[in-house]
Swiss-Prot record:
One of its GO terms (biological process) is regulation of DNA-templated transcription. Keywords: Transcription, Transcription regulation. Transmembrane segments: none annotated. This is 10 kDa anti-sigma factor. Gene3D superfamilies: Anti-Sigma Factor A (1.10.1810.10). Transcriptional inhibitor. Inhibits sigma 70-directed transcription by weakening its interaction with the core of the host's RNA polymerase. This allows Gp55 to successfully compete for the core enzyme. Plays an important role during the prereplicative period of phage T4 development. Disulfide bonds: none annotated. Interacts with the host sigma factor RpoD, and thereby inhibits its interaction with the catalytic core of the host RNA polymerase. It comes from the Viruses. The gene is asiA.
Length: 90
């Protein structure tokens, strides 16, 4: 498994939390998102993230790693999906 997957998993967890708290604005702007990640202490190989390192760790993921991470992300929103379904199917 790719060594970057844990860092990307942490990044996805942060994105998930921001989305759940309606702060998509932070996630949608890459520079702001990277600044936010740095502020909360997310690092790659002991260094703060920047545009290049962010792009690099994501691009080095295998297709299998990406699928695993997407499945984990969607699983985290399962409760939200059920909630929305409950209120939209009245």
């Amino acid at each position: 498994m790719n060594k970057n997957i844990d860092t990307v998993r942490e990044i996805i967890t942060v994105a998930s939390i921001l989305i759940k708290f309606s702060r998509e604005d932070i996630v949608e702007n890459r520079a702001n998102f990277i600044a936010f990640l740095n502020e909360i202490g997310v690092t790659h190989e002991g260094r703060k993230l920047n545009q290049n390192s962010f792009r690099k760790i994501v691009s080095e993921l295998t297709q299998e790693d990406k699928k695993t991470l997407i499945d984990e992300f969607n699983e985290g929103f399962e409760g939200v999906y059920r909630y929305l379904e409950m209120y939209t199917n009245k």
